[in-house]
Each structure stands twice: as C-alpha cells, then as structure tokens.
C-alpha cells in the first residue's frame, strides 16, 4: 500500500513497485490507509507492506496512521517516507513504529532496499 497526498508521487511509486514485482494499493491519506488496510484484512487479504508519507497537509499523516495500524495489526510492516531528511521521525523511525525510512525523492534501488529492510 502506498499512502501519499500527491497523486503524481503515488503513481510514480506505484510504477516502481510494479517493476519490483509488487501489486500496490494507492490511498491519499491516513484515514483511507486505515480503512483500506482493515477492509483487506477482514477479507483475508492482508497487506504485506505500507509506505506512508509522513506529512499529509489537512489530513492524517504517517505517524498517526502508523500508530493506528499497529493497534489493528501489531505485525504491520510500515515504511515512512518524507521529503524532510532531517525530520526526527525519519532519523529515529523505529521509535515511531516504522520498519524502515526513505527520503523523497527516491529511486528504484533506494525503494528496493527500504522494502528489503522492512520485510526482514
């Protein structure tokens, strides 16, 4: 699952994930991510990995959404993504419940490494 408020970034990340052999689900904010994650989980189709934008102007961002997802599923694997490399959440991502962090913009190799790290 990819959560980002910018449609262009969702689309780009989706294309990268497809190249890496994944089937992405796209959502625009934390509320959509939580609802879709729960819906899929209830249908027996668990989400393997979520990539969450840290900051969603006017909506629920990655930190809050990750906390809720981890309450629903303690085994959720979540990567935090941000354009702000000096953000304390990026620097200390594990303390905030994330499995990996990636700074935007990222290329295919960086995304692949973050996914490998998160799924370990």
What do the predicted segments below correspond to?
Residues 31, 35-38, 63-76:
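Short amphipathic alpha-helix used as the core "switch/output" element in two-component signaling
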Residues 11-19:
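Charged docking surfaces used in two-component/phosphorelay signaling
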Residues 68, 93-101:
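As written
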Residues 53-54:
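Active-site residues of response regulator receiver
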Residues 3-5, 27, 50:
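Conserved sequence signature across two-component system core domains
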């Amino acid at each position: 699952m990819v959560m980002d408020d910018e449609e262009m970034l969702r689309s780009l990340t989706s294309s990268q994930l497809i190249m890496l052999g994944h089937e992405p689900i796209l959502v625009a904010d934390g509320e959509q991510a939580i609802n879709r994650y729960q819906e899929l989980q209830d249908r027996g189709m668990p989400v393997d990995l979520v990539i969450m934008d840290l900051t969603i102007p006017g909506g629920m961002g990655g930190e809050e959404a990750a906390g809720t997802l981890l309450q629903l599923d303690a085994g959720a694997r979540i990567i935090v993504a941000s354009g702000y490399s000096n953000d304390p959440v990026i620097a200390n991502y594990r303390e905030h419940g994330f499995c990996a962090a990636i700074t935007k913009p990222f290329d295919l190799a960086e995304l692949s490494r973050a996914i490998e790290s998160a799924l370990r």
